[in-house]
Amino acid sequence: MFETITPLFPGLPGGPELLVVLLIVVLLFGANKIPKLARSSGQAIGEFQRGREEIEDELQDMTGDDDEDDATSESSADSVSTDSVSTESSN
């Protein structure tokens, strides 16, 4: 049964293949530019994550505001009805 299931990523390179890819990268870009490329790639990933978090926060605020507004209006209505009951009982 499990022999027929194909892996999610069938062509991921292993140890020797990664060494060949690393050698090609060094030959293409040179050893001096690799740290700069790694640094800029890390910064790009960080900016992408910050942007994603900002969008997630905005979406939560948008969906959360509706729920909070409903809860606030309900609690306001409860306090108004409680105040009116206490005022009527004082008279």
Swiss-Prot record:
Lineage: superkingdom: Archaea
Function statement: Part of the twin-arginine translocation (Tat) system that transports large folded proteins containing a characteristic twin-arginine motif in their signal peptide across membranes. TatA could form the protein-conducting channel of the Tat system.
Note from the entry: H.volcanii possesses two TatA translocases: TatAo and TatAt. Each may interact with specific Tat substrates.
GO CC annotations, alphabetized: cytoplasm; TAT protein transport complex
Membrane topology, record value: Single-pass membrane protein
Comp. bias regions, Low complexity: 73-91
Name of protein: Sec-independent protein translocase protein TatAt
Transmembrane segments: 9-29
NCBIfam families noted in UniProt: tatAE
Any single biological process term in GO: protein transport by the Tat complex
Biased composition (Acidic residues): 54-72
Any GO molecular function: protein transmembrane transporter activity
InterPro entries in the cross-refs: TatA/B/E (IPR003369), TatA/E (IPR006312)
Family: Belongs to the TatA/E family.
Region (Disordered): 48-91
Subunit comment: Forms a complex with TatC. Cytoplasmic and membrane-bound TatA form high-molecular-weight complexes.
Keyword tags: Cell membrane, Cytoplasm, Membrane, Protein transport, Translocation, Transmembrane, Transmembrane helix, Transport
Subcellular location: Cell membrane; Cytoplasm
